[in-house]
Every structure is written in C-alpha cells, then in structure tokens.
Amino acid sequence: MATTVKSRFPLLLFLGIIFLASVCVTYANYDEGSETRVPGQRERGRQEGEKEEKRHGEWRPSYEKEEHEEEKQKYRYQREKKEQKEVQPGRERWEREEDEEQVEEEWRGSQRREDPEERARLRHREERTKRDRRHQREGEEEERSSESQEHRNPFLFKSNKFLTLFENENGHIRRLQRFDKRSDLFENLQNYRLVEYRAKPHTIFLPQHIDADLILVVLNGKAILTVLSPNDRNSYNLERGDTIKIPAGTTSYLVNQDDEEDLRVVDFVIPVNRPGKFEAFGLSENKNQYLRGFSKNILEASLNTKYETIEKVLLEEQEKKPQQLRDRKRTQQGEERDAIIKVSREQIEELRKLAKSSSKKSLPSEFEPFNLRSHKPEYSNKFGKLFEITPEKKYPQLQDLDILVSCVEINKGALMLPHYNSRAIVVLLVNEGKGNLELLGLKNEQQEREDRKERNNEVQRYEARLSPGDVVIIPAGHPVAISASSNLNLLGFGINAKNNQRNFLSGSDDNVISQIENPVKELTFPGSSQEVNRLIKNQKQSHFASAEPEQKEEESQRKRSPLSSVLDSFY
C-alpha cells in the first residue's frame, strides 16, 4: 500500500499544481482592470471606503461639490471621446478632430454659462443684439415709409435724396437730386438745383467759383462771406436769414466765425452752361485746382516767373498742414479734398475787421446781402409769419433771375390756410420742425400730354409728413395747406415770381372765394349765397389759424371740466 501511494505521489503533486494554477487564473480574471495593490494598500482602501460610507449624507462644502461635478463632467467628456473613437474607427482624422472640438466647445460653453459674470455678459450681449435689431427694423420701416410717401407723392423729396459731394470732419456739401428726373411735372425745373453746406466752428470753405448764379441763404450760424471782383473785394458778416446773390463765375469764400454753433447754408443754383449741371473751380492745393491745367509755358509767361517757383508757391502740396492731411484721409466722397479746413481764431479776427453787416436799408445795393426778417412780414398773427423778398425794383438782385425768396414760420398747432400761387413754382425746404402738408392736384397728372383725352381729371390729394431737410415742390395753381406739429420753419424759392399773386381759399382777408358775386356763388356751390358767405365768415383769422376748429376747441374745453379731469387721472 505504501508502495502504491509512493508511486502515485508525483501524479497527485502534478494534479495539485494544476488545481492551484486554475485557482490563480480565476482570481486574476476577477480582478482584471483594477490596480495592483499590495495587502497594506488594500487594507487602507477598505478603511477609507468604510469612512466614506460613514460620511455619506453629511454636509460638504459647495466648492467640493463643484469640483466633484467638474471632475465627473471631464470624465464623461473623456469617456465619450474615447467611445467615439472606438465606434467610428473608419472616419477621417480631421472629422474626428472636428467632432472633438465641437464636444469640447459645448463643454466649455456649459462651464461659461455656470459662471455668474459670464451669464451677465451673455444677457447684456443678447439685449444689445435685440436692441440693435429693433433699431435696424425701425430704421428700415421708416425708410420704407419715406419711400412709400415719395412713391405716392411725386412732389416730396425726402432728406435722404441729397447726395453727399464732399464730407470730412469739418463739414459737408450735399446736392439734391435733379427735380426733372423725378417727374415730367418738373420739366421747367431742370435748370434749378439745391445745394446744402454745413461747417463746424472756425472752418472755411476755400476760394472757388461756380459756373452758375447762386442765391445764398444762411439757415443757422454766423458767417463771413468774401466776394471778389477784378478790382474790388467785399466782405460781409452774415447771420440767420441773410440772403445774397452771387453771380456766376464770382470767386468767393465763406468762414464760420462762430465759436460753438455749426454754420448751415443753402444755395439755390441756376447753371449757365448746361441745364441742371454746374462745376466748381477751386484754387486750393488739390488736383481740382484749375491753375494746374495750364502748361508750363503759359504759367511762366502769365506770371513772369520760372515754373519751379510757381509750382512751389501755388501748386505744390504743402507739408505744414497736418490738419489738412487728416482731412484728406477722412474724406469719404468727392475729389475736392481740401474744400473745408480749420482756420485759427487770429485769422478769423483779421477777416472780421473788414467785414460789413448785411444791409438794413430799405433799398439795398445790387451786390449787398439783405435779411429776410429785417422787414415787416407780409402776413403775421399769433399763429405764424411769412417774410418775403420779391423781384421788384427795391431788390434788384432778384430781378434778372425772376425769383422770390420767402421764410415761413408756423407755430406748433397752427395752420397756414389753403392757398395757391398764380405763377410761381415754389421749392420749399424744411429748415426746422415737423408738420404735415396737403397738396391738391389731378389724378394721373404725370401722364404724357397725348394721354390727356383719356385722363381722369378727378382731384387728387397728396400728403406729406414734413421733417428737417425735406423738400416739397408746389407747382403754380396747386392749392396747398401746411400744419405744424412743432414750431415749423420753412424756406421757399419761387420761380416765375414776377407778378405772382398768392390767393387764399379761406380766412377773413385775401380770400378769393369771398370775392365771387352772390349769383355766381349760387351757381357754383350747392348752398345758397347766404350760406356760403356765413360759412366764409366763420374763420376770423387770416393767412394763419389754429389747426383745430374753434368748435372742437370749445368741446375739448368743456370736456376738461374739474370732474372730467379727476376721472381722467384714473385712466
């Protein structure tokens, strides 16, 4: 028996070794993926686990929670990144990188949104974006509204119809589009243009001449205008309302002498070479300077000087004027790079010494300026005033041009009563304020003459909401009425002004309807002559009146009783 056991011992030993090996393999598979730990570490891990279980449910600081959550997010992000690589092994490397960047950006975005300061910045950015979009939408709606007004009313030119010819930090020059390009109605206006100038304090429009007659009117500010002739020079102190004619080809320059207020000037331009087109010829140091156009021989012979000296003194661009160089860089449109530049206070004082004020005499000379407001107004009451200069003998400047100049002031809530001009075509510029205009014409008035037989002669009302810078054309014979929603200041240029007559359709004075004889009134109107006369006499004011009828005013005053005032406070 002992011999048998001894002979089988190696076999039993071998089987025991195999059993132990299988046990070890099974244990190893069970612990796969975990870190290798020594017995001491395993014991410490067990103890820490027990401690963690004891702490479970206890209060933890917020920063520990945030750090724990952040670690979990990072772990999830890395795990998703790894799984994405494993699931899509066949994708291009750049595609995987894009996906990784997107996931990472989303994770960073979530982190930023959790930051209170970042959330505030995001809210501010979103509010600013909404505000910008709202302003843009309002601007587009206003532009569409103005375009719609112009489409419905060919007599209205909104302020955005001015084209900027020149602009820099010192001011700008703008020209209104041609009248005859808008409609055949304005065919007789093809040789008239409107130009607006604006200059900052202590600036100068440098010397130039234009191939057009100009009627210059100061809208705002104070200026010094110098007008040159072959053997003379005249300088004038100009203020608001001053008007002067500058004949075609006259060299002149204009200075804003005020310390604070911008200078605003408007020119009514009558070209002499080509209908509706004019050019400015300047003497300042730019490529539009007309002296540059002459040949060297002509310049040397004319000035009896070598060309090098002429070029240095008259033609070379100077390097001593950094302000002008900055203006050139800031110029946005046009080629007149130095049209408006800064001028020193000392230079202004020197120019001011020789300047005369506008004429206050009743009979101004042919070349002196006159002020629209220095004479008695044509019409005046508590609702408004109209000042007007007509081409009569006492105003010889306007005689050869057959143009009148007028200034209309309508107080807030007032109305210039319906009227029409017998001969004059009026170009009306809104200088200040807002209001409404109603102009009467005929339907399809813009059609060609050959279509007149088929044209409907029904009366058409054209309406316009007036804002500063807007221009309205009022043809002769077309009735018009203007109301003011704020104090309204208008400047008018009337063409074909000689023997023009303004006929009012309502009011106690200058009312053409009141002059109709009674028998004709009965034939003309549905009511009797007595009813017509009584109706006409209801308006006690002349030329200007309240925009609200007296009956409505009385009703509104009755409604504003103490009881109604108390009740209104609850609504």
UniProtKB/Swiss-Prot annotation:
Subcellular location: Vacuole, Aleurone grain; Vacuole
Chain segments carrying region Disordered: 33-153, 320-339, 539-571
One Gene Ontology term, aspect cellular component: vacuole
Signal peptide from the UniProt entry: 1-28
Basic and acidic residues composition bias: residue spans: 40-96, 105-138
Main location: other
Function statement: Seed storage protein.
Compositional bias of kind Polar residues: 562-571
Gene3D superfamilies: Jelly Rolls (2.60.120.10)
Protein name: Convicilin
Domain of life: Eukaryota
GO molecular function, one term: nutrient reservoir activity
InterPro entries in the record: Cupin_1 (IPR006045), RmlC-like_jellyroll (IPR014710), RmlC_Cupin_sf (IPR011051), Seed_Storage-Functional (IPR050253)
Database matches in SMART domains: Cupin_1 (SM00835)
Family: Belongs to the 7S seed storage protein family.
Keywords from the named record: Seed storage protein, Signal, Storage protein, Vacuole
Signal recorded as keyword: yes
Domain spans labelled Cupin type-1: 154-311, 370-533
CDD domains: cupin_7S_vicilin-like_C (cd02245), cupin_7S_vicilin-like_N (cd02244)
Keyword Signal: yes
Species of origin: Pisum sativum
